[in-house]
Amino acid sequence: MVQLNILTDRLFLKEMNNCNAGSEVVTIAPNGEFYICPAFYLDNAPNIGDLIKGLDIKNGQLYKISHAPICRICDAYQCKRCVWLNKLYTHEVNTPGHEQCVVSHIERNASWLLLMELQTYGILDDCKIEKIAYIDPFEKIEK
């Protein structure tokens, strides 16, 4: 089957497929210091440890999907949930910015449209993506 990356990724995912920076992976810089991800290193953010002292992530639970109130109830599974963008736009690593959510939901809805078309040909009949009437999860939460 031909794959269209972001659109087809959502068709085959059953749960979030984020980068998991800070919860499952970290970056080691050329100087031996650890960072949440390469973006934090390039942004000159404070390190989270080094090869000598080890890893020290303050409030590490905040990097986990279980502590991300918006993301943990979302089904835009292809979203990368970039914690650096979260920190940049909302000042919180576990809260996404408006733009990141909207882009991910536009991708998700395009995946839904693709799925509807494929299913008219009997392809991916067992796949299910619910139709939604919003592109920003904050709209859903505010209601």
Predicted regions mapped to residue ranges:
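Radical SAM enzyme core and accessory elements
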Residues: 73-143
